[in-house]
């Protein structure tokens, strides 16, 4: 799905003159900061649509020819800098006409409201007047009013681009079945913290390792049919957590994508190069994790456990949890562990995954890390 920034023209893309008509080339001036802001938003995956009221356009007081020349030059300037508008929607009515197509009315938006490929949750409206904010409210999207001497406002283009392109990656998932009721709240850019309650204290402790060592904020509340056994609770928690990660990542622009973290220290942990992933020791145990947010879920596990359970967590459900996480998140994960102490082995698996996640989730600009154009 594609997010769209709907943009007013006069006073937002170009400076508005005292007579409120840009009908001559000498009146054409770009608003400060608009080009770098739109480039940043473009690189973050946004499309652009101009929505503008042009009072009486085509009438004797505002001839079409007087509008066309400066408007074409404006579009050419933006195009020369790599900024292309998906559409230019113009209402030509007078304010007294109360036309439904005139902002803040949304009559010009019928085709867009029927488009199922628009990401409305991330879309926004940018303008310089209160009517632009009302237009945004009517569309149920976020509105930004540029700061101008004529109409006030609180925003500049740099702040708008930062807010939209660098928005925190958050998600809330509620998974409710006849067997479990699970709520996951995740913030991939939040301060590392965990609040976990699943009814399985050892499992809670393992999930806390993900939040701590991946550097994310994670809240999980799970109520399951533990009177039967632990399977449904652990499996569905993995599915809900994976769904939340996938949702928070959005279109994955700018992420590292891969989690492998090759050794960068002056010494090398034994076996790290051979495993090719993030490798960590825990006493006699060593675990390695390498992952890819490819959108193609796959899980490979190498390791064995001697004990039937560690604490209240069956060891057979350790790889099953990771498989569920991969299935729901679209992640490819290769995880291996060897050692003597099963507690250490389970905990090392969760910590190795978390450290690989930390690298894969990091932002590096806004470029999509794929030649296919989608992940």
Swiss-Prot record:
GO terms for cellular component: cytoplasm. It catalyses: D-erythro-1-(imidazol-4-yl)glycerol 3-phosphate = 3-(imidazol-4-yl)-2-oxopropyl phosphate + H2O; L-histidinol phosphate + H2O = L-histidinol + phosphate. Gene3D superfamilies: HAD superfamily/HAD-like (3.40.50.1000), Imidazole glycerol phosphate dehydratase, domain 1 (3.30.230.40). Its cofactor is Mg(2+). One of its GO terms (molecular function) is imidazoleglycerol-phosphate dehydratase activity. PANTHER family: IMIDAZOLEGLYCEROL-PHOSPHATE DEHYDRATASE, IMIDAZOLEGLYCEROL-PHOSPHATE DEHYDRATASE HIS7. This is Histidine biosynthesis bifunctional protein HisB.
């Amino acid at each position: 799905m594609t997010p769209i920034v709907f943009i007013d023209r006069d006073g937002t893309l170009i400076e508005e003159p005292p007579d409120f008509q840009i009908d001559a080339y000498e009146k054409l001036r770009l608003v400060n900061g608009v080009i770098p802001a739109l480039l940043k938003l473009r690189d973050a995956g946004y499309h652009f649509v101009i929505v503008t009221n042009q009072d009486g356009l085509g009438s004797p007081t505002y001839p079409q020819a007087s509008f066309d020349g400066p408007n074409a030059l404006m579009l050419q300037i933006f195009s020369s800098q790599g900024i292309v508008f998906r559409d230019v929607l113009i209402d030509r009515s007078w304010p007294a006409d109360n036309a439904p197509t005139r902002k803040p009315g949304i009559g010009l938006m019928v085709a867009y409201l029927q488009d199922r490929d628009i990401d409305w949750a991330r879309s926004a409206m940018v303008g310089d007047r209160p009517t632009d904010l009302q237009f945004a409210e009517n569309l149920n999207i976020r509105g930004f009013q540029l700061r101008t001497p004529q109409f006030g406002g609180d925003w500049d283009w740099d702040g708008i681009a930062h807010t939209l392109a660098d928005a925190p990656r958050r998600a809330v998932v509620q998974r409710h079945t006849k067997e479990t009721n699970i709520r996951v709240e995740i913030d991939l850019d939040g301060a590392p913290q965990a609040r976990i309650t699943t009814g399985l204290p050892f499992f809670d402790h393992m999930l806390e390792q993900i939040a701590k060592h991946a550097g994310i904020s994670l809240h999980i509340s799970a109520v399951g049919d533990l009177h039967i056994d632990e399977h449904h609770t652990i499996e569905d928690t993995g599915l809900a957590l994976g769904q939340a990660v996938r949702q928070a990542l959005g279109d994955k622009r700018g992420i590292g994508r891969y989690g492998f973290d090759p050794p960068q220290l002056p010494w090398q942990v034994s076996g790290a190069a051979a495993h090719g992933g993030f490798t960590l020791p825990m006493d006699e145990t060593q675990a390695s994790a390498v992952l890819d947010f490819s959108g193609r879920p796959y899980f490979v596990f190498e390791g064995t456990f001697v004990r039937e359970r560690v604490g209240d967590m069956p060891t057979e459900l350790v790889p099953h949890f990771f498989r569920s996480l991969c299935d729901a998140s679209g992640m490819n994960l290769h995880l291996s562990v060897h050692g003597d102490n099963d507690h250490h082995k389970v905990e090392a698996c969760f910590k190795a995954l978390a450290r690989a996640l930390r690298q894969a989730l990091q932002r590096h600009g806004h470029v999509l890390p794929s030649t296919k154009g989608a992940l």
